[in-house]
């Protein structure tokens, strides 16, 4: 299987420690690089039962009951941009419980697994790279992916914290191209509410009711916004009243534009405005004429059974005819005008050069 490897003396927790390629190969049995199916160069590393071995030996190692929480697992990221995360410990099924798959993008892992900083088994993450002494910016997205995947696998198998030793080893992540990969991990952080709003995603209510809010209502839902307006003493305009107010505002604006366009001296306008303000004219109230409930000839009370004549008066059943109440309305003239309006006279133009 290989020799035991001691890591405590040369790696600091939470830092991306610089390790030369020769030292990495000597201490961790760094496997020879190879071209994968996508023509990208990447190393193969595997830690089984506390022993470093090549990926070809990983299939012969039987996992112990607390295999994932007691023994350090190895992940490796390869490719020019570090797009794929591969697990070389008994295939990827031990890390992401998705079955033996060739690789998963960081976004897919972040979406499918819960984000946690510390798991129940005390695993810690250490980044080993040969690109120089750099610190991850930030390291939390990488930690969350590894912790959540291993923790989910252990919970499904029914493992408990009591099986863990007092000082469990760390989980190592080897990044051959650490700079691009760490920057890519920083993009996995969940967007803030402002970024979600700018991206067009729904934003939760600002009052914390759990429903979605609307930027037009101060990022609150309709119910919370109504309560907010009632508490602040604001009057919420309804649909018809708001439309009437908008129409009146448009009328006022049109009148203002028309008055500005007229060539009237400013002194006269100011004087008229001042006089109208000091001496307001009484408002003319147009009252609707009450319907007559008595006959205009015999003064008999007819109520709702009266007959309205075209002359403008109301009569009973006996005096409703024009010859009974000496009606002065010109029925013939009205009919003649109606016929003339309905049948206009069309005359053709006279020919000037008529032969």
Swiss-Prot record:
UniProt GO MF annotations: DNA binding; zinc ion binding
Chain positions recorded as Zn(2+) 2 binding sites: 295, 298, 316, 319
Pfam families (alphabetical): zf-A20 (PF01754), zf-AN1 (PF01428)
Amino acids binding Zn(2+) 3: 309, 311, 325, 327
Binding site for Zn(2+) 1: 205, 209, 221, 224
InterPro entries (UniProt xref): AN1-like_Znf, AN1_A20_ZnFinger, Znf_A20, Znf_AN1
Induction of expression: By cold, dehydration and salt stress.
Record bears the keyword Zinc-finger: yes
Residue ranges covered by zinc fingers (AN1-type): 289-335
ZnF endpoints (A20-type): 199-233
Name of the featured protein: Zinc finger A20 and AN1 domain-containing stress-associated protein 3
Keywords: Metal-binding, Stress response, Zinc, Zinc-finger
């Amino acid at each position: 299987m290989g020799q035991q490897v001691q890591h405590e003396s040369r790696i600091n927790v939470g830092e991306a420690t610089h390790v030369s390629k020769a030292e990495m190969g000597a201490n961790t049995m760094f496997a020879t690089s190879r071209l994968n199916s996508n023509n990208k160069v990447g190393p193969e590393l595997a830690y089984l039962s506390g022993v470093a071995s090549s990926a070809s030996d990983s299939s012969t190692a039987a996992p112990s009951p607390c295999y994932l929480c007691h023994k350090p697992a190895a992940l490796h990221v390869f490719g020019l941009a570090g797009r794929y995360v591969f697990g070389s410990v008994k295939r990827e099924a031990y890390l992401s419980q998705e079955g033996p798959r060739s690789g998963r993008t960081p976004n897919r892992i972040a979406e499918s697994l819960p984000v946690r900083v510390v798991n129940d088994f005390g695993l810690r993450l250490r980044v080993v790279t040969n690109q120089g002494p750099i610190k991850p910016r930030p390291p939390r997205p990488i930690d969350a992916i590894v912790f959540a995947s291993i923790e989910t696998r252990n919970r499904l198998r029914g493992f408990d914290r009591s099986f863990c030793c007092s000082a469990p080893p760390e989980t190592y992540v080897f990044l051959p191209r650490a700079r691009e990969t760490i920057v890519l991990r920083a993009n996995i952080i969940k967007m803030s509410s402002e970024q979600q709003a700018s991206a067009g995603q729904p934003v939760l209510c600002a009052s914390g009711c759990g429903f979605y809010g609307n930027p037009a209502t101060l990022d609150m839902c309709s119910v919370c916004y109504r309560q907010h307006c009632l508490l602040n003493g604001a009057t919420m305009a309804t649909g018809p009243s708001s439309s009437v107010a908008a129409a009146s505002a448009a009328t006022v604006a049109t009148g203002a534009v028309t008055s500005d366009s007229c060539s009237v001296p400013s002194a006269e306008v100011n004087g008229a405005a001042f006089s109208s303000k000091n001496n307001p004219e009484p408002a003319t109230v147009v009252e609707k004429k009450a319907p007559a409930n008595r006959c205009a000839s015999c003064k008999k009370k007819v109520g709702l059974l009266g007959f309205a004549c075209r002359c403008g008066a109301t009569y009973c059943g006996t005096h409703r005819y024009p010859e009974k109440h000496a009606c002065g309305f010109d029925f013939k003239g009205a009919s003649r005008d109606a016929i003339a309006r309905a049948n206009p006279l069309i005359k053709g133009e006279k020919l000037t050069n008529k032969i």
